[in-house]
UniProtKB/Swiss-Prot annotation:
It comes from Clostridium botulinum (strain Kyoto / Type A2). This is Carbamoyl phosphate synthase large chain. Residues 402-549 are annotated as: Oligomerization domain. GO terms for cellular component: cytoplasm. The lineage of its organism: Bacteria, Bacillati, Bacillota, Clostridia, Eubacteriales. PANTHER family: CARBAMOYL-PHOSPHATE SYNTHASE [AMMONIA], MITOCHONDRIAL, CARBAMOYLTRANSFERASE FAMILY MEMBER. InterPro entries: ATP-grasp (IPR011761), ATP_grasp_subdomain_1 (IPR013815), CarbamoylP_synth_lsu (IPR006275), CarbamoylP_synth_lsu_oligo (IPR005480), CarbamoylP_synth_lsu_oligo_sf (IPR036897), CbamoylP_synth_lsu-like_ATP-bd (IPR005479), CbamoylP_synth_lsu_CPSase_dom (IPR005483), MGS-like_dom (IPR011607). Residues 933-1068 form the MGS-like domain. Residues 133-327, 674-864 form the ATP-grasp domain. Mn(2+) 2 binds at residues 298, 300. ATP 1 binds at residues 129, 169, 175-176, 208, 210, 215, 241-243, 284, 298.
Length: 1068
């Protein structure tokens, strides 16, 4: 039992949906914490709204509440479960803010709940900018010259006093949200107003900019007795001025002198002791590169993105140790899980280099402002481990899946030196490639260091890589001798990177390596620099003499992970990978995971029998397969990242379990798939590939408008659009053919029907559908951005039977063994197939939890040859539950400047929440609250700008809103429509007309909700785009789908109140 015998039942608050600034790292740390508490015999109650997580599985906590993360719903859980304690620091900023609010409102006191781990007072001292500054003053800790402000007037006065640029940091926000660097009073007006609005306590810290100083982080653990260790220190390659979540980070720090290292280490420990932290804490410093001057930027008195990185970089399980400290244990009483010999009071030591590189969503949002600053924009990250910096960095670059295997980027070849300088002075996600091009042109290293703020140590490393690339470019393959190839491999060059420079095939380099026996060995991450034997096999590749992998002769399977979190491929795929591993382990099969994401549960050291922290490229995966010689490789759970390895593994005669490469190709190749549908007599929307604007117009005439147009070979709906007339179609096609003349544009009849989705399992003979899901929004909104309902609410028995029939025909026709995801449209009583994915999809965690069918477990067993009829869940459509569960998407577009907000065929959401209720309205109400949609407001003002073809449908919804007491503001045509129906409306000028116009209405806070149905997709020159962006940047609700608006209005009519709703424990 825990040292503190009074702790019997602990409430853990999760972090909710994945948004930019708060991603999968909290699933990893929350899962670890729950396990750590349960190991000590403590009952764990969890509240978290995110169904895509491992954390919300029924076996992770004793009681699992997938409910909105608001004070009202957390109080309901506390009232029902009566925990004696609350652990606040595992749910990111969301969990911390909730814990503080529960404390301030007296709810914790009312129910006798104690906060364990770091106290609320200590959390406030770490999070409240003014209290933190007072602590620093008390211990003589240097801080940057700053002022705490709560209004615009004082903010401007301070800025005028110390001069620009000024850094704006709101209190209690996430990932730098609402912050930024103001270079002028005009910029300060905009950033400060938003920062004050988004801070939960209306407080902002303004500080003098030390942009260009080094940014250093320490991850520190402290127990209740004051024992303190630094787990890991990390150096941001990018200087202060770029959010640490958007920075390239290296561990351990590479450029600090011993004096600097010890100085900052002592300062970190001093801060933790002064605040009284109990658990993990992240401390961020700014260090003057030209002196020993430093300042504390901020601390995070909780587990964080950096603590997940530090855990994976060192093998030290920070969240688990923090949970034990919260129970009263001291560091010298907690065993190191990796070595089982040392204790948690031993500081880890690293004999390797770790590099973290962020993954940005700009491939999805090509019009976005890519310049990096103090506001985080990355959706995820990769981690790479090497025996030297160059190896780790090059591994990291190819792990990003951006098609880069070197530091060369074609588009920078055309730029002048002045243009390249601009690209690194205003750094964006591609700055390293611009920097490399400058070095390629012999720009002086000290000058590059000066203008970028990147230490000369790193510039020298990049220079060496660039010089080797240049040397290869000027060579032939015959010039490549054994010694040179070994040196390149040791420094992280890939076969493809070398081959591209030599203009040969990667296979040629692979052949040479085999002739010369230049193959990687694998070293272990052991937390102690090899001083003690590690029991948890966690490996990285290097080109060295001694190999630390022991290859067994057991039956074994390699599971390929899904890589970094990104829009379209999120935490859902990590959930599936982890469940696959658990299923294999239950069957007594040795499990091996290959992945490169430091935020996830799959890369925890004790999930699989072996973990290889490696890039998910053909070469890196093949090296592991050749080392381990598994009985098979599973690709179905790693999203497109894993699936795209299928053909390569087939060419190498490597067995993939389940669906084969040819079968995957049948589902993904349009022509082959069309042939199959024809053969099976299954309908799909009519369409074809076209090669010119004229062809497109001709085809559209045959099909009839509206039509869905999209480029060939895209993922996540990228570049898709619905066009309603010839003018829109010509505009889309002209742009599309200008970008890509080599591939056809696909044009389909757009059916404005009901979209229905299934995740099914096939064993080659039978099919099991755990649940049929219905989308609230009509077809045309990407399935990942749609509200999903289960059980279906409007699907007839006949259509359900047809869905089962088509699913079985398709699964058996393709030859699926394992998972298949199918999307259907029901239109005018007919059923059409629109898409088939021969793998696990993003709805698997959701439907697994709400149907209570262990989908991944069953699919894994089927891949290994078992039959559905023997697995206890039958075949056909599984029985439907009584409760209704909705999955509501969550967006991060506010954090991405110049990004389109409206829903369409291209996916934009970063996360999701679950709403569970006895009725659809109750479930939707909870889902909307959990997704932070402003649904509780009784009345307000709606700004409506409605597209012509939506006006008729909008009218009855507008009448309902009017009857509820809402007022309207609208532009001319929409205003006329409302007036004709007797609805009072204030007419407002359009964007191009003189002030006050529609944008002024938004900026002057005259509006509570914006309803805008767009006319032309992603054209940022149009009024609608600017209206939506202005609203989202003022933190207003923006609705672009009338289906969503109708659902919200229906809920308001039901007058649902928090106090009347039930909460549901989904662990049973």
């Amino acid at each position: 039992m825990p040292l503190n015998k009074d702790i019997k039942k602990v409430l853990v608050i999760g972090s909710g949906p994945i948004v930019i600034g708060q991603a999968a790292e909290f699933d990893y740390s929350g899962t670890q914490a729950c396990e750590g508490l349960k190991e000590e015999g403590v009952e764990v109650v969890l509240i978290n709204s995110n169904p895509a997580t491992i954390m919300t599985d029924k076996k992770v906590a004793d009681k699992v509440y997938l409910e909105p993360l608001t004070v009202e719903f957390v109080e309901k859980v506390i009232a029902k479960e009566r925990p004696d304690s609350l652990l606040a620091g595992m749910g990111g900023q969301t969990g911390l803010n909730l814990a503080v609010e529960l404390y301030d409102k007296g709810i914790l006191k009312k129910y006798g709940v104690n906060v364990i781990g770091t106290s609320i007072e200590s959390i406030k001292e770490g999070e409240d900018r003014e209290l933190f500054r007072n602590v620093m003053s008390r211990i003589n800790g240097p801080v940057i010259q700053s002022e705490i402000v709560t209004d615009m007037e004082n903010g401007k006065a301070f800025a005028n006093k110390i001069g620009y640029p000024i850094i704006v940091r709101p209190a209690y926000t996430l990932g730098g949200t609402g912050g930024g660097i103001a270079e002028s009073e005009e910029e300060l007006d905009e950033i400060l107003a938003l920062g004050l609005q988004l801070s939960s306590i209306g407080q902002v810290l303004l500080e003098k900019s030390v942009k260009g100083w080094k940014e250093i982080e320490y991850e520190v653990m402290r127990d209740s007795r004051g024992n303190c260790i630094t787990v890991c220190n990390m150096e941001n390659i990018d200087p202060v001025g770029i959010h640490t979540g958007d920075s390239i980070v290296v561990a351990p720090s590479q450029t600090l002198s011993d004096k600097e290292y010890q100085m900052l280490r002592s300062a970190s420990i001093n801060i933790l002791n002064s605040i009284g932290i109990k658990g993990g804490c992240n401390v961020q410093f700014a260090l003057n590169p030209n002196s020993f001057e430093y300042a504390v930027i901020e601390i995070n008195p909780r587990v964080s993105r950096s603590s997940a990185l530090a855990s994976k970089a060192t093998g030290y399980p920070i969240a688990k140790v923090a949970s034990k400290i919260a129970l009263g244990y001291t560091l010298d009483e907690i065993k190191n899980a990796v070595t089982q010999k040392t204790y948690a009071c031993f500081e880890p030591s690293l004999d390797y280099v770790v590099v973290k590189i962020p993954k940005w969503p700009f491939d999805k949002f090509q019009g976005a402002d890519r310049v990096l600053g103090t506001k985080m924009m990355a959706t995820g990250e990769i981690m790479a481990i090497g025996s030297n910096f160059e190896a780790a960095f090059l591994k990291g670059t190819r792990s990003l899946e951006i098609g880069k295997y070197s530091l060369e980027h074609k588009k920078f070849r055309e730029l002048s030196i002045e243009e390249l300088k601009t690209r690194v002075i205003s750094p964006d996600d591609e700055r390293i490639f611009a920097l490399a091009e400058m070095l390629r042109r012999d720009y002086r290293m000290d000058k590059v260091a000066e203008i970028t703020g990147i230490d000369k140590f790193f510039i020298k490393k990049f220079r060496w890589i660039v010089e080797e690339e240049q040397r290869l470019r000027l060579s032939k393959i015959d010039d490549l001798d054994k010694e040179w190839l070994y040196k390149l491999k040791k420094k992280g060059f890939s076969d493809k990177g070398i081959a591209d420079m030599l203009k040969v095939n990667p296979e040629d380099i692979y052949r040479l390596r085999n002739i010369w026996r230049i193959n990687p060995v694998y070293k272990m991450v052991d937390t102690c620099g090899g001083e003690f034997e590690a029991l948890s096999p966690y490996y990285y590749s290097t080109y060295d003499v001694y190999d630390e992998v022991e290859v067994s002769k057991n039956k074994k399977v390699i599971v390929i992970g899904s890589g970094p979190i990104r829009i379209g491929q999120g935490i859902e795929f990590d959930y599936a990978s982890v469940h696959c591993v658990k299923a294999l382990k239950k069957l007594g099969i040795e499990t091996i995971i290959v992945n490169n994401n430091p935020e996830t549960v799959s890369t925890d050291f004790d999930v699989s029998d072996k973990l290889y922290f490696e890039p998910l490229t053909e070469e890196d995966v093949l090296n592991i397969v050749e080392k381990e010689k598994p009985d098979g490789v599973i690709l179905q759970f790693g999203g497109q990242t894993a699936i795209k390895l299928a053909n390569f593994l087939k060419e190498k005669n490597i067995s993939t379990l389940g669906t084969t490469a040819d079968q995957i190709d049948m589902a993904e190749d349009r022509e082959k798939f069309d042939e199959l549908l024809e053969k099976l007599k299954i309908a799909r929307p009519k369409g074809k590939g076209i090669w010119s604007v004229e062809d497109g117009l001709e085809e559209a005439k045959k099909l009839g408008f509206p039509v869905l147009v999209r480029p060939s070979y895209v993922l996540g709906g990228q570049g898709m659009e619905i066009t309603h007339d010839e003018k829109e179609l010509v505009y889309y096609l002209s742009n599309a053919f200008q970008k890509d003349k080599k591939n056809p544009i696909l044009i389909d009849k757009y059916l404005m029907g009901r979209e229905i989705e299934v995740d099914a399992i096939s064993d080659g003979e039978d099919v099991l559908i755990p649940g049929i899901m219905e989308h609230l929004e009509r077809a045309g909104v990407h399935s990942g951005d749609s509200i999903t309902m289960y059980p279906t609410q409007n699907v007839s028995k006949d259509i359900k039977e047809k869905i089962l029939e088509y699913t079985k025909k398709l699964a058996l026709g393709i030859g699926i063994k394992g998972m298949i995801n199918i999307q259907f449209i029901e239109f005018q009583g007919n059923l059409y197939v629109i898409e088939v994915n021969p793998r696990a999809s993003r709805t698997v965690p959701y439907i697994s939890k709400v149907s209570k069918v262990p989908i991944v477990d069953i699919a894994t067993r089927v891949m290994l040859g078992e039959k559905l009829n023997d697995l206890g869940y039958g075949v056909g459509v599984y029985k439907e539950p009584e409760l209704i569960s909705v999955k509501v998407p969550v967006f991060s577009t506010q954090k991405l400047p110049r990004v389109e907000v409206c829903l369409g065929p291209e996916m934009k959401s970063t996360g999701e929440v679950l709403g569970v209720g006895k009725t659809l309205e109750e479930a939707l109400y909870k889902g909307f609250i959990g997704a932070n949609m402003s649904i509780k407001k009784e009345k307000g003002t709606v700004l409506a700008t409605i597209n012509d073809h939506d006006k008729e449908e909008f009218l009855p919804i507008a009448k309902k809103l009017h009857s509820l007491g809402y007022k309207f503001i609208a532009t001319s045509k929409t205003a006329e429509l409302l007036k004709e129906e007797g609805i009072e409306v204030k007419q407002v000028r359009k964007l191009k007309e003189e002030s006050p116009n529609i944008i002024d209405t938004i900026k002057n806070d005259e509006v509570d909700l914006v309803v805008n149905t767009p006319t032309k997709g992603n054209d940022s020159k149009r009024d609608g785009f600017h209206i939506r962006r202005a609203a989202i940047e003022r933190n207003l609700g923006v609705i672009t789908s009338l289906d969503t608006l109708k659902a919200i209005v229906d809920i308001k009519f039901k007058e649902i109140k928090d106090e009347t709703l039930y909460i549901f424990d989904l662990s049973n």
